[in-house]
């Protein structure tokens, strides 16, 4: 009788152990897919699992074997794609092992996004590339030779912004130039737009001299008052709000893209990229600067462990 009892207890303990191990493994696999990735100059790629503890030990500093500067990064279709100078395109399925892809050109690339089952990359001299998988790329005709800097997808439309340029496309292949009353002459720095996003049924584009444009459809654009003259580099819509970052530590928030409030970032360093995930905003910038915030209002500087220029950040969901 006691032998049967001991056997039952032993089997019960074994079963509990197996369930516990399976649960831990499942939690581990889940957390590994939700990661912040930041990119920067000299081929810098950084990782963080939570966006909160940004120390040199938590950051996993990687280099895929090149000194080329990286300008932007996105995540889609279970694939990371990062772009940079000299038409650099690299991709990874896990964020750890990266492969350089052949774009066939030598212009610098500035922005990348994923939408409508397509990766779209933009860059200097009107450069646009598309890919369905992040590996094989095709050059598209943009209809312009101006610099293209930022790209976003929303409401069935890609929107590209650049130097005195706004382009739209439904598929990433065929593009149409949209009219806007740019400052004269067109070469003025205030016509340089660098970031764009979509949210709350509105496209928002940000640029130098604190300029902000909004549009309901990507075609008709209206200028808004930002409240700053600092250059703005990037903008996102997350957690019900727009959030823009820029030079001298500038951070702006808005519920609708029209009314903007400047927030105290606690730094004067230029900020280039921003992302949101795990209920945390992460902004990156010059000299390895990383800031985090739970609400976009209160910001804390974190230790990246590096001094490289950071240009972009994304969160994999």
Regions found by a protein language model. Give the residues of each.
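Bacterial Sec-dependent N-terminal signal peptides
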Residues: 2, 14-35
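Bacterial N-terminal signal peptides that target proteins for export
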Residues: 1-8
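Residue-level hotspots at or immediately adjacent to binding/recognition sites across diverse folds
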Residues: 27-317
């Amino acid at each position: 009788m006691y032998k049967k009892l001991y056997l039952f207890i032993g089997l019960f303990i074994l079963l509990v152990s197996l369930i516990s191990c399976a649960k831990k493994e499942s939690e581990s696999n889940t957390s590994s897919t939700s990661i912040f990735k930041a990119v920067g100059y000299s081929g810098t790629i950084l990782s963080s699992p939570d966006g909160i503890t940004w120390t040199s030990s938590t950051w996993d500093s990687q280099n895929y074997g090149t000194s080329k500067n990286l300008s932007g990064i996105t995540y889609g279709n279970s694939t990371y794609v990062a772009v940079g100078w000299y038409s650099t395109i690299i991709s990874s399925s896990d964020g750890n092992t990266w492969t350089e892809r052949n774009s066939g050109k030598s212009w610098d690339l500035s922005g990348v996004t994923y939408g409508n089952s397509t990766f779209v990359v933009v860059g200097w001299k009107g450069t646009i590339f598309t890919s369905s998988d992040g590996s094989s790329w095709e050059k598209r005709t943009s209809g312009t030779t101006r610099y293209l800097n930022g790209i976003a997808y929303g409401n069935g439309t890609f929107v590209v912004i650049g130097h005195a340029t706004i382009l739209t496309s439904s598929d990433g292949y065929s593009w149409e130039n949209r009219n806007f009353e740019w400052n004269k002459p067109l070469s003025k720095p205030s016509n340089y737009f660098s970031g764009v996003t979509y949210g709350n049924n509105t496209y928002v584009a940000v640029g130098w001299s604190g300029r902000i444009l909004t549009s309901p459809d990507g075609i008709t654009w209206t200028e808004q008052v930002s409240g700053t003259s600092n250059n703005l580099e990037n903008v996102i819509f997350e957690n019900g709000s727009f959030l823009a970052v820029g030079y001298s530590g500038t951070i702006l928030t808005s519920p609708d893209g029209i009314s903007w409030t400047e927030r105290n970032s606690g730094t004067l360093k230029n900020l280039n990229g921003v992302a949101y995930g795990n209920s945390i905003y992460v902004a990156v910038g010059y000299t390895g600067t990383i800031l985090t915030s739970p609400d976009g209002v209160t910001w804390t500087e974190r230790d990246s462990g590096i001094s490289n220029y950071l240009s972009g950040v994304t969160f994999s969901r």
